[in-house]
Amino acid sequence: MFSRVAKTSFSAVRAAKSQFSHSLSQQTSKTWVPAATCSKRSYAAEAKTSAAPVSGQIVAVIGAVVDVQFEDDLPPILNALEVQGRTSRLVLEVAQHLGENTVRTIAMDGTEGLIRGQKCVDTGSPISIPVGPETLGRIINVIGEPIDERGPIGTDRRSAIHAEAPEFVEMSVNQEILVTGIKVVDLLAPYAKGGKIGLFGGAGVGKTVLIMELINNVAKAHGGYSVFAGVGERTREGNDLYHEMIEGGVISLKDDTSKVALVYGQMNEPPGARARVALTGLTVAEYFRDQEGQDVLLFIDNIFRFTQAGSEVSALLGRIPSAVGYQPTLATDMGTMQERITTTKKGSITSVQAIYVPADDLTDPAPATTFAHLDATTVLSRGIAELGIYPAVDPLDSSSRIMDPNVVGERHYSIARGVQKILQDNKTLQDIIAILGMDELSEDDKLTVSRARKIQRFLSQPFQVAEVFTGSPGKLVSMAETIDGFESIIKGECDHLPEIAFYMVGNIQDVKDKADRLAEELS
């Protein structure tokens, strides 16, 4: 009897299970959508938002991390919340949903004075900042507030700092050189439009002046704008840069002819601000590219601080660290930002990123992840700076992915390699010269050394932004003039001209004019 009851019960359960699975499959067949028809954008749009602002209250404050509890709808990840009842504006960015209607957020400013029970309001969107020509000549922080004490930024245009990279169909596949007007860069390590350049340089080798000249030349040669994002840099350095830009004419306080927008998240800011300020700068640059069709220069100083801040945020959120203590999402964080820096059919963003290498270890995960995205490297050498040759770019260490005859042309490529060969041969001969002297060299070697010294001096160039310091007018040299000048040196057409004539001049005609002036003074 027991077995009969068991069989009857089992049959009933099986019948019920069959009926349930049938109804579930019918329901699923109505609502299921093939994965191929769902884009990333439609996924992002699915977050449930309400028309009225959703408010919650703070339930925990742990350093830069703030937990906020809501009664009804939760704000989506990356939404901005604003803390009420504070004199200074405090924005929180949603990072995690914890359960029990609580979200974990990262503060974009100091959390001193926050208490449990304080009210927070969901803004309904990610952090939004002012964009457009009105930002030129101004300094803003990570949440778009002006911090230069010159009043509010007069624009209604705003953009969210989180955006997707351009679609494949929107990207431009043409490899174009961005002519900077700086001889050593254009000849030996040219920048690609929409490329990413790593700028390696210690203190006092002319990094700031090179950055200012690039901003100035791109504005004059291409009519383009620049954006400078100071990520975790010293407040003093940011202040110095601002005043140097005013002195150099890159920023004008009198009219609207400024060529650069500044976005600062200094070293004393909380990690949330430092981790997001690069995205704020990138958003300002994206507006000029996408809405005005500009070729924009984006400077990030220092890209290592972006990674470092991401590591701090990751630890505060309780994620298990990866190699050397970095965040497990290191490659994703870097890739998400770097993929937005590209050339589209409308315009381009070319990024110059200063890179700090911890303990000079290039295998450290932070610089190693950055290198994967770089198209060119510009190395500033202290040894060259000590010789008084500015810009102090190392012509042998600097490199570019587009230094290829198919991109730059056969003539440019062969002249650049010829210049590097002469400089490398001269470097090899320096040991012999140090021990035995110039007299012991063969005639060919003497000629190589003579031409190398002329090339070294011809690689120097007076900058327009440094006119107020040097007293000599700056020079912007076209690509054609640069190639012609170095070709005439390596072919021996300038062997009769004195070395001093090649120092701090523009094109090869300036060399000849300077040589004539020197000859007249001596006669």
Swiss-Prot record:
Q: What processes does the entry annotate via GO biological process terms?
A: proton motive force-driven mitochondrial ATP synthesis
What InterPro entries would the database entry show?
A: AAA+_ATPase, ATP-synt_VA_C, ATP_synth_F1_bsu, ATPase_a/bsu_AS, ATPase_alpha/beta_chains, ATPase_F1/V1/A1_a/bsu_N, ATPase_F1/V1/A1_a/bsu_N_sf, ATPase_F1/V1/A1_a/bsu_nucl-bd
Enzyme Commission code(s) on record: 7.1.2.2
Per UniProt, what is one GO molecular function of this protein?
A: ATP binding
Q: State where it is primarily located.
A: mitochondrion
Name a GO CC annotation attached to this entry. Answer: proton-transporting ATP synthase complex
Arranged from A to Z, the UniProt key words for this protein are:
ATP synthesis, ATP-binding, CF(1), Hydrogen ion transport, Ion transport, Membrane, Mitochondrion, Mitochondrion inner membrane, Nucleotide-binding, Transit peptide, Translocase, Transport
Catalyzed reaction equations: ATP + H2O + 4 H(+)(in) = ADP + phosphate + 5 H(+)(out)
> Binding residues for ATP, per the UniProt record?
201-208
Localization in the cell: Mitochondrion; Mitochondrion inner membrane
Q: Where is the transit peptide?
A: 1-19
How is the quaternary structure described? F-type ATPases have 2 components, CF(1) - the catalytic core - and CF(0) - the membrane proton channel. CF(1) has five subunits: alpha(3), beta(3), gamma(1), delta(1), epsilon(1). CF(0) has three main subunits: a, b and c.
User: Which NCBIfam families does its entry note?
Assistant: atpD
Biological function? Mitochondrial membrane ATP synthase (F(1)F(0) ATP synthase or Complex V) produces ATP from ADP in the presence of a proton gradient across the membrane which is generated by electron transport complexes of the respiratory chain. F-type ATPases consist of two structural domains, F(1) - containing the extramembraneous catalytic core, and F(0) - containing the membrane proton channel, linked together by a central stalk and a peripheral stalk. During catalysis, ATP synthesis in the catalytic domain of F(1) is coupled via a rotary mechanism of the central stalk subunits to proton translocation.
Family according to the record: Belongs to the ATPase alpha/beta chains family.
Query: What is the protein named?
Result: ATP synthase subunit beta, mitochondrial
Q: Please name the source species.
A: Hemicentrotus pulcherrimus (Sea urchin)
